[in-house]
């Protein structure tokens, strides 16, 4: 995978607006299905998840499909890394150069060789005695904490605390990533690490304490493509409509807020639920009853071999909208966003929805990239709110 250049638009001397292009990866799910390896992969994931049932409060991350990457550097001189830009977690971590496992190196058939961080080659790295361990939905990583100079998009944090991973779950070995940069709230951070965004705000490096995510759309998600733009310090007025609907956050852990109502076809639900916006989750997560309603309204069929709900690809543009009511406004998601061509064969496409279970103490919904591609998300840290504006896509 080729790296890409970060574009920095510097404003005043004391603060800035920074626009960082993202890159959308090839879908791991589509790749494994195409190579006939998906069934074995599912079995390994089920075994891993069975061991994670008692992990408690952890970030929501799903790296099975298209997700969005950015370039950073760490250390002096700078060492590059390509990381997931993830609003569903709050820690930054990269891979230790001393880790020699296949997961740390990248599996040969992943088509990507990991960029690792060599602490011995940075004159500004400070190793801490504290260890770190993070359990994500798709696997874990652990190692030790340290501090060094972080740069992303022309923004610099002089002493950013981050994880240096000495062990990665196998799933990360299949992905073209070198780490994760969490954009969630400090309360979600493991080991009370201060996230990069909070450090930037404290150092008054941004025009405004917010960032905007615009994700581009490609009907064929099996291949990696340019993925969108993150604007730090301002609202993206080029790729997002001018009208922004804001809603106060109901918790400052995830980017969590209330969902007033949901409808699809002839089905509607007015029970209020808690939902999170998460760039690290590819699809839409919903309660069991909602997933069942979507399946019924779209006439989807469950494919046991892939554990996916499928419909005919010919219906990609004609299935009913998924209509979310947030802050008193309706946000319809077109079927072209939630019916995905994963090259399953037989003219079948997948529904980009998954079950969150039947409820509990946490959020009941995840609005992942399927929703964010249709609506720019404005993550307003300063005012404790999130905003939504219609995304502009050329040629679609």
Curated annotation (Swiss-Prot):
Induction conditions: Up-regulated by B.thuringiensis endotoxin Cry6Aa (at protein level).
Cited Gene3D superfamilies: Acid Proteases
Protein name listed in UniProt: Aspartic protease 1
Disulfide bonds: 99-104, 313-349
Enzyme Commission code: 3.4.23.-
Chain ranges of the Peptidase A1 domain: 68-389
CDD domains: pepsin_like
Lineage of source species: Eukaryota, Metazoa, Ecdysozoa, Nematoda, Chromadorea
GO CC entries: cytoplasm; external side of apical plasma membrane; extracellular region; lysosome
Quaternary structure annotation from Swiss-Prot or TrEMBL: Interacts with B.thuringiensis endotoxin Cry6Aa; the interaction prevents Cry6Aa proteolysis by host gut proteases.
Keywords for the protein's UniProt record, in alphabetical order: Aspartyl protease, Cytoplasm, Disulfide bond, Glycoprotein, Hydrolase, Lysosome, Necrosis, Protease, Secreted, Signal
Compartment(s) of residence: Cytoplasm; Lysosome; Secreted
Biological role stated in the UniProt entry: Aspartic protease, which is part of the necrosis cell death pathway. Promotes B.thuringiensis Cry6Aa stability by preventing its proteolysis by host gut proteases. Required for Cry6Aa-induced necrotic death of intestinal cells. Cry6Aa uptake into the host intestinal cells triggers an increase in intracellular Ca(2+) levels leading to lysosome rupture and to the subsequent release of asp-1 which leads to necrosis.
Active site (catalytic residues): 86, 278
Pfam families on file: A1_Propeptide (PF07966), Asp (PF00026)
Knocked-out gene: effects: RNAi-mediated knockdown partially prevents neuronal degeneration in a mec-4(u231), deg-1(u38) or gsa-1(Q227L) gain-of-function mutant background.
Ranges in a coiled coil: none
């Amino acid at each position: 995978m080729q790296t890409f250049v970060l574009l920095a638009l510097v404003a005043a001397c004391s603060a800035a607006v920074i626009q960082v292009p993202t890159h959308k990866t090839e879908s791991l799910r589509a790749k494994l299905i195409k190579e006939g390896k998906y069934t074995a992969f599912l079995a390994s994931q089920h075994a891993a998840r069975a061991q994670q049932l008692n992990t408690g409060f952890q970030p929501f991350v799903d790296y099975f499909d298209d997700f969005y990457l950015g370039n950073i550097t760490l250390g002096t001189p700078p060492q590059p890394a390509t990381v997931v830009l993830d609003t569903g977690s709050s820690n930054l971590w990269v891979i230790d150069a001393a880790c020699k496992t296949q997961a740390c190196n990248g599996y040969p058939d992943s088509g990507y060789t990991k960029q690792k961080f060599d602490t011995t080659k940075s004159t500004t790295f400070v190793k801490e005695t504290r260890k770190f361990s993070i359990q994500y939905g798709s696997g874990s990583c652990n190692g030790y904490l340290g501090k060094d100079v972080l740069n992303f998009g022309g923004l610099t944090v002089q002493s950013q605390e981050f994880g240096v991973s000495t062990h990665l779950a196998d799933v990360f070995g299949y992905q073209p990533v070198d780490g994760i940069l969490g954009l969630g709230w400090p309360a979600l951070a493991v080991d009370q690490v201060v996230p990069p965004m909070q450090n930037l705000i404290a150092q008054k490096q941004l025009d405004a304490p917010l960032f905007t995510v615009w994700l581009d759309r490609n009907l064929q998600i099996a291949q990696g493509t340019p993925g969108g733009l993150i604007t730090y310090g301002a609202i993206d007025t080029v790729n997002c409509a001018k009208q922004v609907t804001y809603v106060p956050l109901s918790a400052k852990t995830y980017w969590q807020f209330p969902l007033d109502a949901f409808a699809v076809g002839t089905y509607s639900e007015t029970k209020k639920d808690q939902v999170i916006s998460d760039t690290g989750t590819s699809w839409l997560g919903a309660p069991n009853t909602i997933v069942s309603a979507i399946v019924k309204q779209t006439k989807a069929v469950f494919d046991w071999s892939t554990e996916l709900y499928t419909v005919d690809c010919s219906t990609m543009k004609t299935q009913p909208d998924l209509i979310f009511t947030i802050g008193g406004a309706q946000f319809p998601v077109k079927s072209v966003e939630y019916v995905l061509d994963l090259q399953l064969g037989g003219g079948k496409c997948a529904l980009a929805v998954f079950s969150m279970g039947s409820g509990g103490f946490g959020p009941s919904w995840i609005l992942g990239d399927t929703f964010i591609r249709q609506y720019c998300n404005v993550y307003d840290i300063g005012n404790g709110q999130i905003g939504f504006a219609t995304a502009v896509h050329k040629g679609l």
